[in-house]
Design a protein with these regions (language model features):
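Structured catalytic core of nucleotide-sugar glycosyltransferases
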Residues: 1-102
Length: 102
């Protein structure tokens, strides 16, 4: 079975990011949050979650993705938006489909 890591680039997402993490919690995915020169409120909002936080200084979205990908130790990774625009159920379906093909 393939494991999945989620990479979530974020900047100033104190309102939406905790909700996204809560929605992902039941799926037990490894989660990297890449914070790109974010505000203190975002850091405070997610500091107690079981996620790995990667800090970077204003390098932008592309570099945030690269940093997250470099940290991955699983066969699969997925970029997930911090604003809650993706449904975590779709990730589960995608992973089930991939595993059924192996």
């Amino acid at each position: 079975m393939n494991e999945l890591t989620l990479i979530i680039p974020a900047k100033n997402e104190s309102q939406s990011l905790p909700k996204v993490i809560d929605e992902l919690k039941p799926y037990n995915y490894k989660i990297y949050i890449v914070l790109d020169k974010t505000d203190a409120e975002t850091i405070e909002a997610i500091k107690n979650y079981d996620v790995e936080i990667i800090f970077q200084e204003n390098k932008g979205y592309g570099d945030a993705l690269i940093e997250g990908i470099k940290k991955c130790k699983t066969d699969l990774f997925c970029i997930f938006n911090a604003d809650g625009s993706f449904d975590p159920k779709e990730l589960k379906e995608m992973l089930n489909l991939l595993n059924s093909k192996n």
